[in-house]
Amino acid sequence: MSTHPFPRPLWTLNIAAWLLLAAWVAQIAPAQSDVAELRLTVKDAAGGNLPAAVELVNEAAHTRQRVQLPPDGSYAFRNLPFGFYRLAVSQPGFATASALLELRSAVPVAREVTLGIQPLESTIEVTDAGTLLDLNQTANARYIGAQQVKERRAGQPGRGVIDLVTMEPGWTLEANGVLHPRESEYDTQFVLNGFPVYDNRSPAFAPAVEAENVESMRAYTSGIPAEFGEKLGGVIEINTRRNTSPGFHGTAVAQGGSFSTASGFFSGEYTQGATSASISAEGFLTDRYLDPPVTENYTNHASSSAFTAALDRDWTQFDRISLSVDRRETHLEVPNDLLQQAAGQRQDRNSSDTAGRISYQRILSPSLIGSVRVMVRDTSAGLWSNPLSTPISAAQNRDYREGYFNGSFAGHHGRHEWKTGVEARYASTDEQFGYLIGAYKLLGVRVIDSGYPPVYAFAGHALDREQAGYVQDMIRLGNFTVSGGLRFDHYSLLVNQSGWSPRAAASWHSQSLGIVLHGSYDRTFGTPPFENLLMSASPATSALNGGFYLPLKPSRGNYIEGGFGKAFGGHVRLDASYFRRDVRNFEDDDLLLNTGISFPIAYHSATVRGVEAKLEVPRWGRFSGYLSYSNTIGIAQFPITGGLFLDDGAQALLASTDRFPISQDQRNTARGWVRYQILPRLWTAWSASYNSGLPVEGADQLPDISFLAAEYGSNIVSRVNFDRGRVRPTFSLAASAGIELWRHENRSVTLQADITNLTNRVNLINFAGLLSGTAMAPPRGASIRLRAEF
């Protein structure tokens, strides 16, 4: 009989009721923004308002914004990354004014510009070179700007954000779009417009935030402020809010390409006075969504849709409220290997995410701001298998419902930029999972331990209660910048633990030499992933393989980093760093065959160390580009906790104390990208990536080559170096070209064409072992993207 997903629980989250409660809370509590805000007013020499054109540029943060001011000559630039900005103000008939500004406070900065006989501060034109290097940075933050997002090369649907991040040093990609910041697993935190999301956001786990809806991003792996906790392998801040001129503005995108892929996106925003409202919708169809185990790409169709609505309102010059709701869902097939396809296997998966968010901000004084944020969210996933699934037919339904609260104060006092706050999460998780073993052997080779029962079912429910508080401060002392913070976390989901996390960072700069030296220390308290956690930590699951019950506990880590940033000639920047991480209860995952479903596990400990470097030319005449490289070594130590190990001999791992390379231990990673503006409306870009290869876990326990070739094909097996126990290196080259077909003022139509994997190389990402499935990267592909902005 077919194995169907279990019914969803009768109780469901009432988003509307939670939003009403959130609105009531927001009216009585203060809030604050994590980024800078510039409130600009432009006047003429007689004091009259001017509707001038304004440009803000920060090369270090890849930020370049242009706005036409309204008739009153006033505008608030929001969501600006901290750093140095070139401000240019122009109006026909007036002298252009320019200045270099530093924005380093969450408290809004007011600036008045006078055009006329006496322009702002100086008649000397300020260039972008002054914004190339952030002289007060205490760690390497990687910024991705609006132009990079718009002109990104085409990739697999649902991976636009992920592909942009993996071009940065320190970030690698495993099968099915799983991000690994500095070889960490299950340890990436996404922060969407100030709201943290801790679950796995790879395409195999949850619907993605597609890049078309993103204005800018920041990714960092060190010098992490105390306000961030739980998932600290890497933090990715995503900003979807745009600074636009008053009136209605919209974007429409249509894209089509290889593998029967088609996608569409539309967004519209209306700004009038103190109110801004926006909506967006997107969707895609494709026949290549996950990374298949064979070149034939069997059963890999997927479809996705998403809708978002947001409202921002400045009630007064001191009070602002923001609301948003979004709904995303994805339906996909699980790719088969050769044996599964021959058997007639069909497995379907689905995932959905619904969220409502509200935030309120109040300026309490010229140097103090407060904020509150409230979020409610429901995320779910399911798996269905037909009776021909082999060697196992599995079914799953899991659901996670959370309510999140964050309240904070931030202020500026002399040399200090400080912030303090609290946050809490009240959530529940439900898991239902079952399997039916159809074959313990395939082609005479044992693939599942004979000790496992042929049928197993699990159902669990648990409450998740988490609270945290923090304080942090940044002090500037001449050429020195020092930041420090302290965070306390309490975690209660199956286990009850708490931890203190001190954070410290410092930098020294020389403006004349164009150099910044920096170092940081981060203590981390990392909570286990909630996806399939109840089953992984269940005594009944441990008993399946003769093991014993060891609950998954929060990880505790010590991160150190030292590095520098150097500017050359006002056009070139070099960033380099060395890091080391020591972690107890190191998180990883146990993949269930090729289903994309994984179960959290933890090793006793792990150490990861490495070097990273990036040479970048943000803009030099017609050229821009970068070259990045990272070298890392990650070693973990048994025993292991959690997981669902069906492999023969897996029981030995529960008592072993051996050391081994962790599953995402890719030693060498290099990325390159170059862009050339051929004509004012025509450009081309080329990118390349190199990966030295991931380990093959349990390589000495794999079946003989003939069986592996029958399961995956000889062309896949040939991409494995069994002597080294690693996948062979991969290389991919891509080319893009774009043309602006039409432009009038702020309206434009552009066309972009991309070709990926130009050499059509067979690139293997993972190969089947104890802890990972088999997955290959896409072959050569092409796509065309048409974009209209109005």
Show the residue positions of the predicted features:
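Periplasmic N-terminal accessory/gating domains of Gram-negative outer-membrane beta-barrel systems
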Residues: F94-A95, A99-E112, L120-A226, E230, ...
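Face-selective signature of the C-terminal outer-membrane beta-barrel domain
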Residues: D312-T330, S351-N496, R622, Y626
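Surface-exposed extracellular loop regions of Gram-negative outer-membrane beta-barrel proteins
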Residues: H331, L338, S380, F433-Y435, ...
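Transmembrane beta-barrel wall of Gram-negative outer-membrane proteins
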Residues: G256-L285, T295-L332, D348-G370, P502
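C-terminal beta-signal and adjacent terminal beta-strands/loops
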Residues: H4, R681, S689-E711, R728-S732, ...
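Membrane-embedded beta-barrel scaffold of Gram-negative outer-membrane proteins
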Residues: S371-M375, A381, H509, P551-R609, ...
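Periplasm-facing N-terminal accessory domains of Gram-negative outer-membrane beta-barrel systems
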Residues: Q27-R142, P196-Y198
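Gram-negative outer-membrane beta-barrel transporters
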Residues: R476-T481, Y578-D582, I601-D700
